Amino acid sequence: MLRLLALPLLLVGLHQVESSSRPLPAPLRSNLEHGQWHAGCPVSLSDLRIVSVPYVDFDGRKQDGQIIVHRDVAGSVSTVFRKLYKLKFPIRHMRLSDMYGPPRAVPEDEDVTGSFWCRDSVPSPCVGGTASGNWSNHAYGHAIDINPIENPYFGCGKVYDPRMAPYVDRSKRKKGMVTPAVVRAFRSIGWGWGGDWSGTKDYMHFSTNGH
């Protein structure tokens, strides 16, 4: 997910769906202050919420997931992930420890679905580099990346991680790739998809303003 974009540029049976949101507890706030948030970020930690939702993993098993988003989208994010769960759409990893650590808890494959990370937007692979000088929607908690390995940021024949390369051809449907039903679920809450961009495509990326 967001971790991957810091890399060098390279050529179930379903029951009741429950979800909840809550402010960040003090230990998590402290952890973020030493990593993914700093003074000068466009939102405060008090603006953020943990949204807890069930998801279906790549083995078809129900898991309990968490994602940090801005409080003004917590309800709609909860709604969209309930829809993904009902669709049985597979998500590789979606727990706070997967995204924010500690380091020993971060999955080796880094194929983590997540939202908040106070950082710049990442330039197109056509341009290269890791920072654009402009805040990403992730810095506001207004964007979500879904299964980043299976849904690459792609442009000019380039990706940011070689593990993404097998998923560039979207005509070859593979597990974890964003489907039309997933796009419709996000559109139902007013979010746009990076797969609709002209030129460079960001297949993992959904956001409130479509950017």
Q: Language-model segments: what does each one mean?
A:
Residues 56, 79-90, 119, 149-152, ...:
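Structured segments of extracytoplasmic/periplasmic soluble domains
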